[in-house]
């Protein structure tokens, strides 16, 4: 992998620009990576700031997310992943101080914090074997709403992912 990758994703709804996401991913000396994303969604007046550390297999080690909506901080949470536990600690406008502990039966493969570039990490868990076959990827997310602006707590998730095939050039 390159040492540093950056880019921008434009959000569109019905042909109109509704926001953007700027992201950076850089390799660390230990073989892991750090992913940062700043998401601005004008249609719902939401800004999401995400930073996530990944191990050598792109599994989450820790992550931080802050949401600002309509000029007001909705919440900030820190997710810390241990071999058999996920800890979520934060301060939320709707819930005050929160502290959650979730027992993990296996290492956590996926933590969905809603930047599109982070959502793409689910494809690494799914892999490229058996085109056309759907695999269910278990993980956690911080919100089950499409915009990622509700809840902001650690919630179990299961994502159905199908590898269609390799891109043709």
What are these regions (language model features)?
Residues 8-13, 35-42, 64-68, 88-90, ...:
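Short beta-strand segments that buttress and anchor functional surface loops
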Residues 1-20, 30, 79-167:
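Solvent-exposed helix/loop surface patches that form functional interfaces
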Residues 23-24, 50, 77, 159:
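Residue-level detector of beta-strand structural context in well-folded domains
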Residues 43-95:
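Hydrophobic/aromatic-rich structural module bridging two neighboring secondary-structure elements via a short loop
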Residues 26-28, 53-57, 164:
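Short beta-strand micro-motifs enriched in acidic
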Residues 14-44:
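An N-terminal domain-cap segment
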Residues 35-37, 74, 143:
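Non-transmembrane, interaction-prone segments in cytosolic or luminal domains
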């Amino acid at each position: 992998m390159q040492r540093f990758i950056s880019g921008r994703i434009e959000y569109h709804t019905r042909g109109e620009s509704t926001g953007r996401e700027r992201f950076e991913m850089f390799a660390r000396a230990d073989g892991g990576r750090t992913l940062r994303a700043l998401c601005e969604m004008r249609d719902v007046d939401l800004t999401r700031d995400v930073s996530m550390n990944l191990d050598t297999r792109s599994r989450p080690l820790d992550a931080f997310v802050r949401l600002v909506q309509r000029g007001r901080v909705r919440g900030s949470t820190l997710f810390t992943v241990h071999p058999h536990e996920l800890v979520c600690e934060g301060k939320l406008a709707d819930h005050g101080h929160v502290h959650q502990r979730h027992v993990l039966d296996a290492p956590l493969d996926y933590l969905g914090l809603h930047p599109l570039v982070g959502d793409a990490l689910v494809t690494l868990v799914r892999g490229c074997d058996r085109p056309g076959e759907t695999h269910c990827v278990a993980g956690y997310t911080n919100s089950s709403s499409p915009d990622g602006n509700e809840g902001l707590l650690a919630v179990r998730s299961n994502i159905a992912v199908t590898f269609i095939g390799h891109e043709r050039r």
